[in-house]
Curated annotation (Swiss-Prot):
Gene giving rise to this polypeptide: glgC
Residues holding alpha-D-glucose 1-phosphate: 109, 175, 190-191, 208
GO molecular function list: ATP binding; glucose-1-phosphate adenylyltransferase activity
Similarity comment text for this entry: Belongs to the bacterial/plant glucose-1-phosphate adenylyltransferase family.
Pfam families per UniProt: Hexapep_GlmU, NTP_transferase
Gene Ontology biological process terms, A to Z: glycogen biosynthetic process
Organism: Saccharophagus degradans (strain 2-40 / ATCC 43961 / DSM 17024)
HAMAP family for the chain: GlgC
UniProt-recorded name of the protein: Glucose-1-phosphate adenylyltransferase
Matches recorded under Gene3D superfamilies: Hexapeptide repeat proteins, Spore Coat Polysaccharide Biosynthesis Protein SpsA, Chain A
Length: 425
């Protein structure tokens, strides 16, 4: 039974350092991550994916945070510096960026475990009791104090946060585990094509969320052993966890909604389809992810922008948005927006029609353009009269990417415009 005392949990979180793994590209997002790491990708109208684990840390009372970066990290680093640099150093609080810097070898980060190992001296200087390793590219709201308390109460060497997901979703994408009646992990497979089915929930498997709580000295010992193994891929899911479950106590912490005890909201958004779907969920009347929860806010950096503006109300042109999220700085000037997300500084010109689409910051859609079921990357300028998402063969012929589920991706390069990596965003 977990101790519900808030001071007890607060003491545990103060004794914890969080390390956010934020160096991945997210290759299944294709051109959307050509110029940015996946954790830097915009999400939910005004946020970036990295804001979710960072906000979870802050809301949980964890104020010592390291962010490990590698792949095309400029926009991620810029966002963290602008939005997450106000911690009180005098109180021992910080968010530090830990780029691959070849501290222990001539190589860059070779895997998730190696990324932590290469910062071992920094962690030793901090001397926390517990280390919380987090994936930086998932969308969810989670109290990390609960999993740390679970870890301590069970006496585990390692605790893995997990969630029930459909087998077809987990196949080839997530690490999956088998547990006994005490939630001790007895088997762990990294991204198997045929995940083990849950006995009490047909069609589902128990998937790793990529979040781990370690006793600090235990983690250090395992990292040193792994670094000395020439056959290791230096990955938690592939090497560390499978190698220790037979001899050490590795516990599974099931992530559930505290109010309903059902499986909590968690999205990987690792494909274009899942990214589009997760954003589209937010425009529904009662989405599973509550961004309006004042008890668990998602913090972020945002520029000072004026309110969204809707202009023109003539019979022939009317600027409006319905069942949509429209961010600051947007102007809908005589255009129609339905079931869509407009990120900051988007401009929709007269007679343009946007439906079931995600428009990232600084997109401009000129007169009479029509966009349906699409993702438009940052700073794209959609020419007058262009039609996107209505004819997939035509989209493909112009070099746009169309997913299996019929979502069209458009980037600046596809439009023959200046690459996103050198634009304002």
């Amino acid at each position: 039974m977990l101790d519900p005392n808030s001071r007890y949990v607060s003491r545990l979180t103060r004794d914890t350092v969080a390390l956010v793994l934020a160096g991945g590209r997210g290759s299944r997002l294709h051109e959307l991550t050509d110029w940015r790491a996946k954790p830097a990708l915009h999400f939910g109208g005004k946020f970036r994916i990295i804001d979710f684990p960072l906000s979870n840390c802050v809301n949980s009372g964890i104020r010592r945070i390291g962010i490990l970066t590698q792949y095309k990290a400029h926009s991620l680093i810029r966002h963290v510096i602008r939005g997450w640099s106000s911690f009180k150093k005098e109180f021992g609080e910080y968010v530090e960026i830990l780029p691959a810097s070849q501290r222990y070898s001539p190589n860059w980060y070779q895997g998730t475990a190696d990324a932590i190992y290469q910062n071992l001296d920094i962690l030793q200087a901090e001397a926390p009791k517990y280390i919380l390793v987090l994936s930086g590219d998932h969308v969810y709201q989670m109290d990390y104090g609960a999993i740390i308390a679970h870890h301590v109460e069970t006496g585990a060497d390692l605790t893995v946060s997990c969630i029930e997901v459909p087998i077809e979703e987990a196949a080839g994408s997530f690490g999956v585990m088998t547990v006994d009646d005490d939630n001790r992990i007895i088997r762990f497979d990294e991204k198997p094509q045929r995940p083990t089915e849950l006995a009490n929930k047909p069609g589902y498997t128990l998937a790793s969320m990529g979040n781990y709580v370690f006793n600090t000295e235990f983690l250090f010992d395992q990292l040193r052993k792994d670094a000395a193994d020439p056959d290791s891929e230096h990955d938690f899911g592939k090497n560390i966890i499978p190698n220790i479950i037979a001899e050490k106590l590795v516990s599974a912490y099931r992530f559930r909604d505290h109010d309903t005890n059902e499986t909590a909201y968690w999205r990987d958004v690792g494909t274009l389809d899942s990214f589009w779907e997760a954003n589209m969920e937010l425009v529904s009347p009662n989405p599973s992810l509550n961004l309006y929860n004042h008890d668990w806010p998602i913090w972020t950096y945002q520029t000072q922008l004026p309110p969204a503006k809707f202009v023109f109300d003539d019979d022939s042109r009317r600027g409006y948005a319905v069942d949509s999220m429209v961010s600051g700085g947007c102007i809908v000037s005589g255009g129609k927006v339905k079931s869509s997300l407009l990120f900051s500084d988007v401009h929709i010109h007269s007679y343009a029609e946007i439906e079931e689409s995600v428009l990232l910051p600084e997109v401009e859609v000129h007169r009479s353009a029509k966009i349906k079921k699409a993702i438009i990357d940052s700073a794209c300028v959609i020419p007058e009269g262009m039609i996107i998402g209505h004819d997939h063969e035509h989209d493909k012929a112009r070099g746009f990417r169309v997913t299996k589920k019929g979502v069209t991706l458009v980037t600046r390069e596809m439009l023959g415009q200046q690459p996103a990596g050198t634009s304002a965003k």
